Amino acid sequence: MISEQTIDNNVEQGIASYVDYLNNIRLADLMNTLESILSNETDKLSDLASKSANALSNLDWAKIEINNLIDSNRGGDTGVHGFISEFAETGIRNARVVYQGLQKSVVLLNDNGPADILLQGKEVQMKFYANILEEIKQASNYDKMSMLFPRDHVEVIEKIMSGAKTVEFNGNVLSGSQINNIRKAIEDESALRGVSYDKWLESSVLKYKD
């Protein structure tokens, strides 16, 4: 019998593989790649009936919806990436929690409203820009809800807000002015909202390039 710990590790590895593949493949190959990942996970989790099936169903749902996005080219060549990130975020987060026997933590709204997802009941707007400062500047347009940025961007922000003087981003060391601009933008947004940044900023399970 496969141990619970072994299966748990397999699930985490499968999810990590899912994220890695999103980073490296062309849109045209996305369907086949996700199918391969999910088939592999199905084999690994064959001994866990309920939780495994629920976890895999969330990844399978994301795969189907992402394939539909590609087929319809929703949002065009650039906008489709934003929609893909919403479905990927939802599928991965929910797969993780239902495997632990918990309720789904994310609801994808998909209704063209200001909020993209509900994260543990909170309205959240997702922004995946190459430029961290531009993401932060968008936050003022959604002052009634939380913001969700790529995981690697949030890590940079956390380092800056903790007082780090040397911060790397995309393999480059940020200049003093870049660090100060990001810090000031976060402080200004927090002042407008009346709460610290960790109360309105959420980290994605995905990095920007994912």
Regions found by a protein language model. Give the residues of each.
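Interdomain/boundary linker segments immediately adjacent to catalytic/signaling cores
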Residues: M1-S85
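Long, helix-rich, hydrophobic modules that act as membrane-proximal anchors or helical bundle/coiled-coil regulators
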Residues: I2-Q5, D29-K44, L48, V80, ...
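Glutamate identity and glutamate-enriched acidic tracts
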Residues: E4, E12, E35, E41, ...
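Hydrophobic transmembrane alpha-helix bundles
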Residues: D8, E135-R151
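Arginine residue identity/basic-tract feature
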Residues: R26, R74, R93-R96, K104, ...
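Context-gated lysine
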Residues: K44, K51, K63, K104, ...
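Catalytic centers of nucleases
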Residues: W61-Y142
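Metal-dependent nuclease catalytic core centered on acidic motifs
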Residues: M145-D210
